[in-house]
Amino acid sequence: PEPSIRTVSLPHRGKGNAVREGLILANGKIRLMCDADLAMSVEQIDKFLHKMAEGYDVVIGSREVKGPRRFDEPKLRHFMGKIFNWYVRIVAVGGFSDTQCGYKCFTSIAANILFKRQKLDGWSFDVELLMMATRKSMKIFELPIDWYHKERSKVSFGPASIQMVRDTLLTRI
């Protein structure tokens, strides 16, 4: 069958909720989530598909592993991202350099298992997904991607940071 696109309208309950609902409703064998600001160029999608073809259950985009380039990112944002990922490795799930990159790819089986169990509606849902995938012994690859900083972010830096720290702690409960 040919790929199709459909839109879904949801009440605003956070990024985690929107991604969960979208990937549960999706019906492809491979399901890619990407940030709406397209901070990663669409030309890089092939890299995800090649890794999925190698048998990975989950492929996550990473700005922190060796190889990617970052364009126009403010130094404070980069620093805060490194601190948060350090915190995640200690508190929740180790082994990942960049849990918060908005580009992740799942097999349909992995997506159905993970998103039907995902609870967090906010910005830290990625941590919860990776923790569950690790506990389920899913095969995960962290893929270097080039990333372009976009100013039109909907994230309110201070309140979002506090919520992310709190939500990451909740993943342990």
Residue ranges and their predicted role:
Residues G95, R117-D121, L130-Y148:
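Catalytic donor-sugar/metal-binding loop of nucleotide-sugar-dependent glycosyltransferases
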Residues D167-I173:
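C-terminal, non-catalytic tails of nucleotide-sugar-dependent glycosyltransferases
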Residues V127:
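Short alpha-helical elements of helix-turn-helix
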Residues L38-A39:
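Acidic metal-phosphate-binding loop of nucleotide-sugar-dependent transferases
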Residues L10-L25, I30, V42-W123, K150-I162, ...:
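Acceptor/aglycone-binding surface of glycosyltransferases and processive sugar-polymer synthases
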